[in-house]
């Protein structure tokens, strides 16, 4: 394993590790109580396992997900990827990184959510993002060699001090309504990891990783796949360590029922409260600055990864517009949304993500299956169409626009996984139909 692979792996870790990835584990640790281990292991399985799978599957075809999705349908490939890139990019995730950075770095210092302060902060924030993203070939070096080490050092400092401060406490009782047995805790952790929706970002980041591997001089598809897998495993190990560590500390932090009730009444995020408490207990008044640095670095690396991924994709489908022009357009969009109407955008984006996410996971699994089992195009199209339609009706029913009893009665509906057994049945149906349809088996392009 060479230095380049390590740098790519750490870059991938930094791009995945956004502010939300800091907040989820300690919150899960607190809620899981005596059933911490089944909950956190299940969280790791879906919260890290699915994104890792998403990254490495993108390396099966020399054209990445563009080539793999074209095997299902070229029109579907373009539409699906445009929706994914815009939703996790300038219309949702990138503006959120800026606003989250402001709320956790500047707001605690000025004790105000000043719109002027937010405006100034986001100008500086996106200038830095612009500088890093204008040359995508240097993204890996700038993030993997500089920003990631800073991020890891600051996180490790907080984890070590947090462990020393709180590990001596016994685990709290947790949320016994959700975590009352090994099975229920595993199921809840599985669902929470799934709901991070990082698997969608994996489709975007896969292109960056594959391109970075190619820049090292590797051209054969099987070697690209191996290097992508290795880089993905490096990122996964780092994420696993941090998730379990933060979750364990959260599991041993003493938080009274009164405090929890007060936080809920003020609509404050409990995970943010736990992180703030961890930092202030360990480092006093400096703790809020340390946490601010961690959040800013985590958000910045994620924003850079998303800007590069989105811009490269749109430049690829509209080559007449330069990559740098797309970078400027998407940064400007993100800047405007970060300062105006972010809550409205989030409320609109979540239903879209809830529709796209099951389709994305289904697509990843179908591509993986087709690598090892001869698969016809119709055999992939049928489950994708069925899962897509089901996801639309699931969101409609969940939003209360129309109560659909069939959807509500599906297995795993309580865990937002009702699409999964349907996807399995649809995949079997697709393969049965494929037996009677004259099509050549799908072959992913090799060098």
Swiss-Prot record:
GO molecular function: L-isoleucine transmembrane transporter activity; L-leucine transmembrane transporter activity; L-valine transmembrane transporter activity
Keywords from the UniProt entry: Amino-acid transport, Cell membrane, Membrane, Transmembrane, Transmembrane helix, Transport
GO biological process, one term: isoleucine transport
Subcellular location: Cell membrane
Gene3D superfamilies referenced in this protein's UniProt entry, alphabetically: Amino acid/polyamine transporter I
The keyword Membrane belongs to this UniProt entry's keyword annotation: yes
GO CC entries: plasma membrane
Membrane topology designation: Multi-pass membrane protein
Transmembrane feature ranges: 6-26, 40-60, 74-94, 114-134, 143-163, 193-213, 229-249, 290-310, 326-346, 350-370, 382-402, 417-437
Recorded coiled-coil stretches: none
Subcellular location, principal: membrane
Record InterPro entries: Brnchd-chn_aa_trnsp_Livcs
Main function: Component of the transport system for branched-chain amino acids (leucine, isoleucine and valine), which is coupled to a proton motive force (Potential). Contributes to NaCl tolerance.
Family in the record: Belongs to the branched chain amino acid transporter family.
Extra remark: In Caenorhabditis elegans-killing model mutant strain is attenuated in virulence.
Name of the protein described by the UniProt record: Putative branched-chain amino acid carrier protein SAOUHSC_01411
